[in-house]
Amino acid sequence: ELKLNSYDLGVDIELADAVQRLRFEHPEIGAVVLRSARDNVFCAGANIRMLGKATHGHKVNFCKFTNETRCSIEDATEHSGQHYLAAVNGACAGGGYELALAADHIMLIDDRRSSVALPETPLLAVLPGTGGLTRVTDKRKVRRDLADVFCSTEEGVRGRRAVEWRLVDEAVPPSAWADRVAARAAEFAARSDRPRGAQGVALSRLLAVFRAVPLPVA
């Protein structure tokens, strides 16, 4: 059971498929918004119960696959001009924040509850598994001392402090949230150099691929 918008391998396979379809089938789309349909949680990251039952090899390959999905988001921006925005409305922790880190621009609703966090080390005694530390320091240019504090505490960072620490790009009051997200998406779409009138490439159906190529059982 996936609670708090957590994800397992199946969810990430579908996400990876969606990223490729948006990139190659829809040249008219210049910006994509990652958001949650739930008000109080953006994404809690990988499902802990699933990981607790998994073998070491499964965990390693799961982390590799999820990181490749995040890399594919960044690659779609760098090489295909399709920009991604993360609209964080609620708790955004662990792999959920690592997903947001793959986006060009991170927006955080400033409602005194929503926050971003990488709590794996204090809670589970492990390092973030899908590029969180690297993207915090190398991509977002968070100061090393602040990154150390951020990754060693359970509590997430909210509002203006998250902006000051460079963990997100902007904190938006709830009253302006919907309009600001729409405006920012339009702004990034206008920057895109994707050919609006081009013909997309139809990709094979995901289920058809799985049926044609049986997966080995670990």
State what each model feature region is.
Residues 1-35, 139-158, 165, 169-218:
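Intrinsically disordered, low-complexity segments enriched in small/flexible residues
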Residues 2, 36-71, 122-125:
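Glycine- (often His-adjacent) and acidic-residue-rich active-site loop
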Residues 14-15, 34, 47, 69, ...:
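Terminal peptide-recognition signature
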Residues 39-43, 93, 218:
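Short, active-site-adjacent cap segments at secondary-structure transitions
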Residues 84, 106-107, 171:
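Short, well-ordered beta-strand core segments
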Residues 93-148, 181:
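CoA-thioester-processing core
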